[in-house]
A protein has these predicted regions:
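Individual transmembrane alpha-helix segments
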Residues: 1, 270-303
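Interfacial loop-to-helix junctions that mark the boundaries of transmembrane helices
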Residues: 1-13, 36, 60-65, 105-108, ...
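Hydrophobic transmembrane alpha-helices
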Residues: 2-9, 14-73
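Hydrophobic core segments of alpha-helical transmembrane domains in multi-pass membrane transport
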Residues: 16-29, 49-54, 119-122, 147-159, ...
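Alpha-helical membrane segments and adjacent membrane-interface helices in multi-pass membrane proteins
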Residues: 58-117
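Short helix-perturbing small/polar motifs within transmembrane alpha-helices
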Residues: 112-154, 158
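Membrane-water interface at loop-to-transmembrane-helix junctions
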Residues: 141-145, 176-179, 212-229
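Juxtamembrane non-transmembrane "cap" segments at the membrane-aqueous interface
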Residues: 156, 243-274
């Protein structure tokens, strides 16, 4: 659902960039106020894992694919402010290194995927968890519904931006984007629930209540588990991800505005590959690009969080 350059008009680009900057600024302030320094590696790990997971497109109906957004996963495990920071790091990296999402459309993508999606996920998760209870079943129910709602919210926000830009009629694009992402959102929900279920059993302190939670101990083990899973995804799964168009690309092809997409700058690692390695091994080219991206995502998110974190704080507000 990454909006490329060329889809949105100047007014929409400017307004979404302003809203995204406002949301990110508030999130950075919250992180500065409430993030314990010992949780910094988890933000880097979340960014790296979400980057790796977003490389894995899964097929859905009507020749379309989807991939994990990861906003709900980050919101559940990190809280909304830290989730916004981690998601923004991923989107910035994807735009600059992989041309996945336009440079001029970065504000729109950050607003949709890094601000709206985590905030909706957190609100839904908190509300459902209060109703369903803090048992594992209640947590997973809240997680799944929050993940589905976050995907729908991001899709409808994107649809509104396309309509506001005059690309396609409001009713047409809202129905098309909403319809396809209702299905993609189910995949988002299932994948997020599975990951949270594993985390809740292995590291239950990471699935914190929606208010205040004690900072988890032994972060080295959590980071090691997450890093191993991220590497496994890139090595074993990423090269076999679906090549079908994602929801936005499918809608663009269906309604004839796919040709409007332009690249504001060439990608350093086009199509998530290290080009010199493609001839020797396409699999290795994809794995190498994924590894580079995951490391950079970890480094960017870790650096920002480390600069903002509060030394000595032992609790984190979700």
């Amino acid at each position: 659902m990454h909006v490329p350059d060329g889809f949105l008009d100047a007014r929409t680009l400017i307004s979404t960039a302003g809203l995204a900057a406002m949301g990110l600024g508030l999130a950075l302030r919250e992180v500065r106020r409430h993030l314990p320094a010992r949780r910094v590696p988890l933000i880097g790990l979340a960014a790296a894992f979400i980057f790796a997971a977003q490389m894995l497109n899964f097929p859905v109906a009507a020749g379309t694919s989807g991939h994990l957004i990861g906003a709900a996963l980050a919101a559940v495990l990190l809280g909304p402010a830290a989730a916004i920071v981690a998601m923004t790091a991923v989107l910035l990296l994807q735009a600059l290194m992989f041309a996945d999402g336009g440079i001029t459309a970065l504000g729109a993508n950050v607003l949709n995927l890094a601000v709206i999606a985590p905030l909706v996920a957190h609100a839904v998760y908190s509300a459902v968890r209060r109703l369903a209870g803090e048992s594992l079943q209640g947590t997973l129910l809240a997680t799944g519904f929050a993940a589905w709602c976050s995907a729908m919210a991001a899709a409808l926000a994107c649809a509104a931006q396309l309509a506001a830009s005059g690309v396609v009629a409001w009713g047409t694009v809202l129905a098309a984007m909403g319809g396809v992402h209702m299905v993609i959102g189910l995949g988002e929900a299932v994948i997020t629930m599975l990951i949270v279920a594993v985390v809740a059993r292995a590291r239950p302190e990471l699935v914190a209540p929606a208010t205040t939670a004690t900072a988890p101990p032994r972060h080295r083990a959590a980071v090691a588990y997450g890093a191993t899973l991220s590497i496994g995804l890139m090595i074993l799964v990423a090269p076999f991800a679906s090549s079908l168009p994602d929801g936005l690309a499918h809608v663009a092809e269906r309604f004839g505005f796919a040709e409007s997409a332009v690249a504001a700058q060439p990608a350093l690692l086009p199509d998530y590959t290290v080009v010199p390695l493609v001839a020797a091994s396409p699999w290795l080219a994809t794995v190498a690009a994924g590894a580079i991206g995951a490391l950079v995502a970890f480094a960017v998110a870790w650096f920002v969080a480390r600069a903002l974190a509060t030394p000595g704080r032992t609790t984190v507000r979700h």
